[in-house]
Structure formats: C-alpha cells, structure tokens
Regions:
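Conserved amphipathic alpha-helix within the SDR
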Residues: 1-11
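Substrate-binding pocket helix/loop in short-chain dehydrogenase/reductase
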Residues: 27-28, 35-40
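Active-site loop-to-helix junction immediately N-terminal to the catalytic Tyr of the SDR YXXXK motif
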Residues: 31, 77-85, 97
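Active-site helix of classical SDR
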Residues: 51, 87
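Residue(s) in the substrate-gating loop at a strand-loop-helix junction
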Residues: 71
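Active-site-adjacent segment of SDR/Rossmann-fold oxidoreductases
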Residues: 76, 97-108
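SDR active-site lid
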Residues: 104-174
C-alpha cells in the first residue's frame, strides 16, 4: 500500500491529502441510482479509504496531518450538482468528527473546501459510462454563480497556509469564504440566490422545466 510504503521509506508520515473527486450533476429527477453510487464511491469512499490507510500510521507515530478535499459545495447547498454537494458535505462531517477524536493522539485533520478551481473537472461533465442526462456547462455555470475560476497554484499556497495554521476548515479563495460566511449568517439570502440561479439554469440548459400541475377539484 502506498501509505505504508512511504512510511517505510521515509520513517514517518507527516501529511496526507485525500483528493478524490468527480463531478456528478443534473436535475435530480433525471438522475439514476448509478449517478448517486458513482459520486459516493469516488468522492466519499475514496476519502474513507485514504483515512483508513493513513490514520493508523499517524496514530502509531503520534503525529501527522490529514487533509480531506471537500468543496465550498460541502458547506453551501449547490443545486443541479446535488450528488456532488451531498458527498462533499459528508467529507466535511467526516473530517470534523475525526478531528475531534484525533487531537488527543497528536494527529490533525482538516477539511479543504475550495471554491471553483480552474481544473479539467469544469469541462468533463458526468462520467461518460453513466446514463446520459442533461446537465450544466460546468465552466459557464460556476462562472455565473461564483465568479472566475481560481488557479490551482494559488489554491495550493492557501492550502499550505491553512495546514500550517491547523485550520479545521480551509476555505479559499476569499470570495468562497465570504459566500460561506453569508450562508452562516443569512442562509435565506443564499437560498434566494440559488433559486434565481436554478431558474436561469433550467432555461439555459433545458433542465427539466417546471410543469404547472392542475390542482383544481
């Protein structure tokens, strides 16, 4: 196993980044169970496997830091990427709960919650082997919702600073931190923003338009 091999080679394991993640999205009514299962298998189980490999080693040596990559979508609701958002919320919960257990053993745990980062995930869409559903143009949608994507190099600098400071939740860039704080302070404002973005996306991408239902007797 990679973790054990690194520990044998170097005699210590100081820092582990669990960075598994794929984008899975679309209107929930269009998704199949396979969409949900794939998101869970990669985005959540991938992190669980990383923790299961690294945590025992760090317990034995009495130090180390595990950084689990979630997303700002793990702190704030994210319509039309609901499976992704769900799994990233789970990664935050895993990280903060484990952090409470690990502290007494000298092991640190952080949840990394970046905003939109300029990587290939913005252009990939759903995995090609899953049933085809209408989904978003990731790059266009997130730019509208969250502003221009953040460079991976700038994120790396912010992450290492957060690790050095032992932050429980590392949120970057600044606009992502502001969005999170707004959600904590005034969640109804974020909800209204989400509703507007959902209406725009339904029209823009043809995502399961709302059909009026006749409820008259």
């Amino acid at each position: 196993m990679l973790v054990e091999e690194a520990h044998r080679r170097d005699g210590r394991l100081d820092l582990v980044f669990n960075n598994a993640g794929i984008g899975v999205g679309g209107a929930v009514e269009d998704l199949t169970l396979s969409h949900w299962e794939r998101a869970i298998d990669v985005n959540l189980r991938g992190v669980v496997h990383g923790v299961a490999a690294a945590y025992p080693v760090m317990l034995r040596q009495g130090h180390g830091h595990i950084v689990n990559t979630a997303s700002v979508a793990g702190l704030i609701p994210a319509p039309f990427i609901t499976p992704y958002s769900m799994t990233k919320h789970a990664v935050v919960g895993l990280s903060l709960s484990l952090r409470g257990e690990a502290a007494a053993h000298g092991v640190r745990v952080s949840a990394l919650c970046p905003g939109t980062v300029d990587t290939a995930i913005l252009d990939r869409g759903n995995p090609e082997d899953l049933p085809d559903v209408r989904t978003l143009d990731g790059r266009e949608y997130v730019t509208r919702v969250a502003g221009a994507p953040y460079s991976a190099d700038a994120l790396a600098t912010d992450v290492l600073r957060g690790v050095q400071l032992n932050r429980a939740v590392i949120v970057a860039p600044r606009r992502a931190r502001m969005a999170w704080r707004l959600h904590l302070a005034a969640p109804w404002i974020v909800e209204q923003m989400n509703l507007r973005n959902v209406a725009w996306a339904r029209e823009r991408y043809g995502l399961s338009p709302v059909v009026a239902v006749d409820t008259s007797p």
